[in-house]
Amino acid sequence: MSKKLKGPDGRIPDRLPDGRPAVAWERRWTEGTLPLWLVATAGGIAVIFVLGIFFYGSYQGVGAGG
């Protein structure tokens, strides 16, 4: 099987005509997408960064008096 089977919308069908899965289970959720661990890591870093900005802002001027 040299070429990929694709539907009219460009997606790979779930099953081949003989009933076997069209894509191996190892690549089922990662083909053409970002790995979930990478998205989660970037999201976690972004959350920590935003919280850091809020904490920094909340302590700006504390003790300055005036």
Curated annotation (Swiss-Prot):
It is a single-pass membrane protein. One of its GO terms (cellular component) is plasma membrane-derived thylakoid membrane. InterPro entries: PSII_PsbJ, PSII_PsbJ_sf. Keywords: Membrane, Photosynthesis, Photosystem II, Reaction center, Thylakoid, Transmembrane, Transmembrane helix. One of its GO terms (biological process) is photosynthesis. Its main location: membrane. The chain crosses the membrane at residues 36-56. It comes from the Bacteria. Gene3D superfamilies: 6.10.250.2070. It is found in: Cellular thylakoid membrane. Pfam families: PsbJ (PF01788). Belongs to the PsbJ family. HAMAP family: PSII_PsbJ (MF_01305). PSII is composed of 1 copy each of membrane proteins PsbA, PsbB, PsbC, PsbD, PsbE, PsbF, PsbH, PsbI, PsbJ, PsbK, PsbL, PsbM, PsbT, PsbX, PsbY, Psb30/Ycf12, peripheral proteins PsbO, CyanoQ (PsbQ), PsbU, PsbV and a large number of cofactors. It forms dimeric complexes. NCBIfam families: PRK02565.1 (NF002722). One of the components of the core complex of photosystem II (PSII). PSII is a light-driven water:plastoquinone oxidoreductase that uses light energy to abstract electrons from H(2)O, generating O(2) and a proton gradient subsequently used for ATP formation. It consists of a core antenna complex that captures photons, and an electron transfer chain that converts photonic excitation into a charge separation. This is Photosystem II reaction center protein J. It comes from Prochlorococcus marinus (strain MIT 9215). The lineage of its organism: Bacteria, Bacillati, Cyanobacteriota, Cyanophyceae, Synechococcales. The gene is psbJ.
